[in-house]
């Protein structure tokens, strides 16, 4: 983890084992108290046990930082090691301060897993940081097939200084693709939706002869649909749980009748040209999770405008990226459903 790495870096310039060992202990202490907080925001005042561990960590790193400052060396290699240790220590101290005291414009939250939680500190608005560190110093060229119109404002660019070029697409979507919307299905919140959706999915996959990338907004929906289709269809069904992403995509590519069921991790970065991928099925509009700690804090900041400024743009971008898995070359054809 981060503090194990920091202990190693500091150990190259400080030889006192009580200091370097103390850094390694910070990681273990944080793991013990943050494991149950994964996926949650940390707001002041913190629970006592978390406050105690974070405060102890802050004091230990303060001692390390004081020791680093006191080191006087003329050796260039040692100077570089000292600088790196100070930089990493200072960054960790700053993050702990924000988590302990809170800081306007920042949010503290815990990511990772219960076994390996990570304390994260993120700005609610990246614009000032980007302006100071990038836009005021460099000319930048940003390219993507899915750049939202609001990007310049979101990342702190002066819109008067931004030039936008839309080069269009080399693909003839109208001639090579169809959009199928199963408007006859019941509301997704209705009890009978899943059974009807499975019937629809089975019919679509059969019509395509396999060759399907089915994308879901949750692992639960993916697992349920995959199990149901395995019992109904006489063709290979792979899921995102089966293999690492590169091997999974390769296995899907190698067998034309194979179907791949996946979640948000494969809404982008999947490039399978040709007949192997002829049908992309998307189970729901991929709105971001309401309990995402960073987005939740940004929603609180924006108030009533949050849905239109955060949720809709992100869902639109994810939907566009998912649909973009279908047509990868000028000769590809298929259906998005």
Please give the residue ranges for each predicted region.
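ASCE RecA-like P-loop NTPase motor cores
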Residues: 1-337
């Amino acid at each position: 983890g981060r503090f194990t790495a920091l202990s190693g870096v500091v150990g190259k310039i400080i030889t006192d084992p009580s200091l370097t060992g103390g850094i390694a202990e910070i990681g273990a202490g944080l793991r013990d108290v943050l494991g149950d907080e994964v996926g949650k925001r940390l707001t002041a005042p913190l629970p006592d046990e978390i406050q105690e561990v974070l405060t102890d960590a802050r004091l230990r790193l303060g001692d390390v930082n004081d020791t680093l400052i006191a080191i006087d060396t003329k050796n260039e290699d040692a100077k570089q090691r000292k600088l790196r240790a100070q930089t990493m220590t200072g960054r960790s101290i700053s993050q702990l301060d924000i988590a302990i005291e809170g800081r306007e414009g920042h949010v503290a939250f815990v990511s990772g897993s219960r076994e390996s939680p990570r304390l994260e500190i993120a700005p609610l608005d990246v614009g000032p940081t980007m302006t100071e560190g990038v836009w005021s110093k460099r000319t930048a060229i940003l390219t993507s097939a899915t750049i939202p119109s609001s990007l310049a404002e979101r990342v702190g660019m002066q819109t008067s200084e931004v030039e936008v070029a839309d080069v269009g697409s080399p693909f003839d979507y109208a001639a090579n693709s169809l959009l199928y919307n199963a408007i006859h299905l019941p509301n997704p919140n209705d009890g009978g939706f899943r059974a009807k959706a499975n019937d629809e999915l089975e019919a679509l996959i059969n019509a395509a002869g396999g060759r399907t990338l089915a994308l879901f907004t949750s692992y639960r929906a993916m697992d349920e649909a995959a199990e149901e289709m395995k019992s109904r269809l006489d063709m290979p069904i792979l899921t995102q749980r089966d293999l690492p992403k590169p091997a999974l995509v390769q296995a899907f590519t190698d067998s034309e009748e194979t179907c791949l069921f996946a979640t948000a991790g494969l809404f982008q970065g999947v490039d399978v040209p040709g007949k192997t991928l002829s049908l992309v099925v998307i189970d729901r509009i991929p709105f971001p999770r309401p309990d995402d700690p960073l987005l939740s804090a940004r929603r609180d900041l924006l108030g009533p405008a949050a849905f239109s400024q955060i949720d809709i743009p992100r869902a639109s971008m994810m939907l566009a990226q998912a649909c973009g898995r279908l047509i990868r070359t000028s000769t590809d054809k298929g259906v998005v459903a």
